[in-house]
Amino acid sequence: MKQLSSAEVRQLFLDFFKEKGHTIEPSAPLVPNNDPTILWINSGVATMKKYFDGSVIPDNPRMANAQKSIRTNDIENVGKTARHHTFFEMLGNFSIGDYFKEGAILFAWEFLTSPKWIGFDPDKLYVTVYPEDEEAKTLWREKIGLSEDHIVEIEDNFWDIGIGPSGPDSEIFYDRGPAFGDDESDPELYPGGENERYLEIWNLVFSQFNHNPDGTYTPLPKQNIDTGMGLERMVSIIQDAPTNFETDLFMPIIREVEQISGVKYGHSQENDVAFKVIADHIRTVAFAIGDGALPSNEGRGYILRRLLRRAVRYAKVLTINEPFMYKLVPVVGKIMNSFYPEVENQTDFIQKVIRTEEERFHETLNEGLAILETILKNAKETNEQTIKGADIFKLYDTFGFPVELTEEYAEDHGLKVDHAGFEAEMKEQRDRARSARADVKSMQVQGELLANLTDKSEFVGYNTTEHVSEILYLIQDDTLVDEVASGSEAQVIFKETPFYAESGGQVADKGTIESETGVAYVEDVQKAPNKQNLHRISVKEGVLKTGDTVKLAVDKVKRRETIKNHTATHLLHRALKDTLGEHVNQAGSLVSPDRLRFDFSHFGQITEEELTKMEEIVNEKIWEQINVIIEEMPIAEAKELGAMALFGEKYGEVVRVVQVGKYSIELCGGVHVRNTADIGLFKIVSETGIGAGTRRIEAVTGKEAYRFVTEQENTLKQTANLLKTTTKETPQKVEQLQADLREVRRENESLLSKLASAASADIFESPEEIGGVKVIAKQVNAKDMNQLRQFVDNWKDKKIGGVLVLGAVQGDKVNLISAVSEDAIKAGYHAGKLLKEVATRCGGNGGGRPDMAQAGGKNPAELGTALDYVSTWVKEQQA
C-alpha cells in the first residue's frame, strides 16, 4: 500500500475516473442552491438529484466528484468516537443510464487494489450485499474472485430515501487486523457490525427501482450508479492512523490548538475529546461561512452558532478562556487549499465572523450564569428539589450552557436536574426541525417522455424577438400528440425559438404563436431535461399541429423592461461588493418586467448611507452610457478577466460573459440591454433581512422607477398639505409635532400619577386583616398595566405592607397585578403564585416574582369573584 497524503488520495480518485471517461464535477457550495429539502449539501449525490430523477440529462452520463459535505444529526458524538464528523468529504462516481453493477464493481476493485492506484491487499477487503441481490453476489464472486467468506449478506443494504430512485447497495470494508478487535465471541465483529476492525470505505448504490408515491416499486427507465467513499476514512487506513483525527486532515489543527492552550494531545482522554471537537467544528464553520452561511438563531445559521459554542465550551477543558477559534482558520485554509481555495481566499472575512461570534458567546455565557443563579435561588425559595427540564433546555439552547455545567451548579446548591424533561425538550426541537421539511419531496420519480426527446432546439432570442420556426413536439398529459385544439393547454418544443426559458433569476418570455390554422399564447417557458426550451401554451383559436410552420413573437414590451432589470441587477451586484465588501455573494434573484429582487449574503444591517451609495453608483453607471459587451469564451479565460459566477452554479468549458465596460463582468445566460443608458433610472424600493445572514433588495428601473418616484413625491405633497407647510419644511414640521406630542404625553402621565395617588386614599383605606396580615383586593379604574403599577408604587410608598391584588377591566379583557411586602414574603406569601390562582378564576393566566406579579384575563364578568378569592387564599396559606 502506498504512503499518500489526503490531497494525493483525493486527486488519485479523480484521475482514475477521468481516465475511465468520467467528467469531473466541481465541488458544489455547502449551502444548497434551489433545494429546500436539505439544510446542507450532505453527500456527493445531493448535487446530482436532477440527473437521477431525469429532470436534467447530463452532457456525459459518467461523472465523478470530491464533494465537501456537512451532516449534523449526530453532533453530540463528534469528538467521542473515532470517525464521527460534521464536515467531511465524499468521493463519488456516478453513472446515469450508462454502466451499471458490473462496471461499478470492476472500477471500485481496480482503484482499491491496483498498484497504479491505491494498492490495497485484496485479502484485506470484504463486501456486503443485499440478500436478494443475486447479481451483485455473482459479480463479486465470479468477476472479482472473492471467496464466500469475504461476502456478507446484510438486510439493510438497500438505499431508499422515499419517493424517487432506489435500489440495493454493496459496501466495501477494509480489515485493519486483530489489533482493532480479535474477540471471536463478539457478535458485532464482522464487516457491517459495530466494531473498529472492519472499516467501511466505499458504498456502491445500484439505483434500479422507482419508489412510487403509492409505495410500490417499479423498474427505472434508466438504471443509475451512485457511489460514496469517505476521504477521511480512506486516509486513516492509508496513513495507518488509529482514528481519522490522527491524519493530515486534522493533526495540523490539533497542533495549533496545542500551541494556543499549552496542553498536549494524546495524554488525557478528556483533553483529546476537546481537541477533536475543536478540530472538527472549525473545519465545518470555516467552510460553511466561506460558502455563504452565517451564525444566527435559525436554520443553518443556528447550527453554525451551536458548533462554535460547543467548541468554545470544550476549549475551557484545555484552559482556553478567550476567543481563539478564529486563529485556526488559516490552518484549515492551508490544509485544504490544493483543492478548496475558498477558505484561504476568504480568511479575513471568515475570521471576522468567527471572532465576533466568539466574543458574543463569552458575553452570553455570563448572562446565562446570571439566569442560572436566579433559577437556583427561586428553586430554593420554593423548596423545589429539581431544576426543570425546560429551564435546563433554555440555558443549553439560548446560552450554550452544557447540561453537565448546569448539573454541577445544581449539585453545589443541593439540587438535582430533570434529565428526562430536558431530553423531551430536545426531542421536540428535533421534531420541529424535521417537520419543517417533512412535506418537501427530496427527489422526483424518474420520468421517461421528456428524457427521450433528444432533437435539438436552438434559442435565437438573444438577437431577435420574432422568428419563423417549426413545431417539433406537442405534449398533452405527458403524452406526445399530433395536434391541440382551441381551448386546450399543451407543451411545445420548437426547432428554434426566440422565447427565453426561465433561468438565472430571469423570468420566462411570454408572447404569441401563429400558424395557418391556429393561434396560441405562450404562458411559460422552462428547460426540458435535454436542454430544449419547453413552452407551456394555451390555444386561443383553431388548431396547432406537429410539423406546422409557425410565427413566434415575444411580447416586446415585457422583454424590454425585463432586460433593463437584468442589466441593473449586474450593476447592483458589483455596487454591493464595492460598498459592503467582497464577501457579498448572490443568494437568489428575480428579474421580471416590473421589478428586480436581489438576495445576498451579509452579516450586518445596511445603513441608509450605504443604500444611497449603492443607488448612486448604479445610476452613475447608467448615465455614463456604457456599452454592454456579450461574448462566449473558455471558462479559464473568463476567470482571468475576473468574471463573477453565480454562487453554486455549475458551468461548462465555454461560458457566456456579460461585460458592462470594466465595471461589471459576470457569467450569465440571460438577455441584456445594449447600453446602460437604456435602463434610464434605477431606484431601490426596499431593503430587508429575509433569514440568517441573508438580505434582500428590491428595486425598479425605467418607467417603474419614474412611477415610484412620482408616487413618493405625491405622498410628500399630501403630507405637506396636511401639515400646512411646504415639502421642503415637512421634516422640521414633523419634528416639532413629535416634540409637542412628547410634552403632552409627559403631562398626561403626571396627571394620571396624581389621579392614582388621589384614588389610592380610598383604595388603601381600611385594609382587611387576616391573621395579622393586611389584605387589599379591589377593582379599580386603570386604563392599562402602567397605571396599575402606579397604584402598586403608591401602596409601597405608604408602607401599608401585607398582600395587594388589584384588577381593572379594559374592554373585554382584565388586567391584574399583585404585590407582597418583604415581611409577608418571609412569612411564605408569594405574589406570583397568588396571582396565578386569581387569574385562572377570570379566564386568564400569569405569574411572576415573590414580591410582584401581573397577569391578564378574558372574562371581566368574573373579576369580582376572582378578587374575593384573595382572602380565601391568604387563609389557606395560614392553615
Curated annotation (Swiss-Prot):
Which residues are Zn(2+)-binding? 566, 570, 668, 672
Q: How the cofactor binds, per note?
A: Binds 1 zinc ion per subunit.
Q: Is tRNA-binding given among the entry's keywords?
A: yes
Location(s) in or outside the cell: Cytoplasm
Database matches in SMART domains: tRNA_SAD (SM00863)
* Cofactor(s) the protein requires to work: Zn(2+)
Q: What is its EC number?
A: 6.1.1.7
InterPro entries, A to Z: aa-tRNA-synth_II/BPL/LPL, Ala-tRNA-lgiase_IIc, Ala-tRNA-ligase_IIc_anticod-bd, Ala-tRNA-synth_IIc_core, Ala-tRNA-synth_IIc_N, Ala-tRNA_ligase, Ala_tRNA_ligase_euk/bac, DHHA1_dom
Domain comment? Consists of three domains; the N-terminal catalytic domain, the editing domain and the C-terminal C-Ala domain. The editing domain removes incorrectly charged amino acids, while the C-Ala domain, along with tRNA(Ala), serves as a bridge to cooperatively bring together the editing and aminoacylation centers thus stimulating deacylation of misacylated tRNAs.
**What role does this protein play?**
Catalyzes the attachment of alanine to tRNA(Ala) in a two-step reaction: alanine is first activated by ATP to form Ala-AMP and then transferred to the acceptor end of tRNA(Ala). Also edits incorrectly charged Ser-tRNA(Ala) and Gly-tRNA(Ala) via its editing domain.
Tell me which PANTHER family the record gives: ALANINE--TRNA LIGASE, CYTOPLASMIC, ALANYL-TRNA SYNTHETASE
Q: What is this protein called?
A: Alanine--tRNA ligase
The record lists the organism as: Listeria innocua serovar 6a (strain ATCC BAA-680 / CLIP 11262)
The protein's gene is named alaS
